[in-house]
Amino acid sequence: MRAYLQLMCKRFRTAVVSAVLLWAGAAGALPKPHVVAFGKWTSAKWYVGPAEGKPLELKVRALFVDTRLKEYTTGVPHDVTDRLFVVRRVFRLNDTLPSESTLAPRWVWERGGWLLVDRVTGRVTQITLPEFDPFYSTGSWYRDYVAYCGVSDDGKKLFAVVAQLGRRKPILKRVLGGPDGDDLPDSECPAPAWQRQPTRVTFQPDETQKITFGVRGHAVDIVNDTEEDEEGGE
């Protein structure tokens, strides 16, 4: 009887230890929650113009994931979902010449494209936007769409572009004409204006040109003046 009790106690202890180990393993397999946060705003100088001699104030703040610096950002983030958001990227570029003998790099601020941030996984990725020019293009977000005026690689064409997250090609790319080639940022056209019900976006690169597109899923159609007048009279 005594031997039987000892055997049962031993089996019980083994079962308890096994259960604890299984629980610990399962707990370790669970994904750890990530903390995504922004730092404080700071002012930086962004030099523009033909000789890059005109300083503009650039509001910058750091993006941290689990207290680790990931990127520098500017502007207000846009929440795509309760999990994903996008924000404009800025970065520091080494402006030191090969002939300059200095131990410390000469850093200058530059504006980049857009970042996609996942609050759950903590992943930060750069978004590839066709014809997006970091100097001239101003992105206007609505849901998972972004509208902007893009510039061709040779600088001779200005495009109305609508892109959607998760799609490699834009759902809209239409030539608006030629860029003015101004030396100031965001000077080619203002941020496009969105509206809902129905979903539409309006581009107005100058006072003489205004064009509206209707967006339905992955399809985009131009909206003529007659349609706008009819809806305005309802």
Task: Name these PLM-found stretches.
Residues 3-16:
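Bacterial N-terminal signal peptides that target proteins for export
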Residues 28-234:
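Exposed acidic/polar residues on beta-strands and adjacent loops within beta-sheet cores, strongest
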Residues 17-22:
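Hydrophobic alpha-helical targeting segments used for export or membrane insertion
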Residues 24-26:
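N-terminal signal peptide c-region/cleavage motif recognized by signal peptidases
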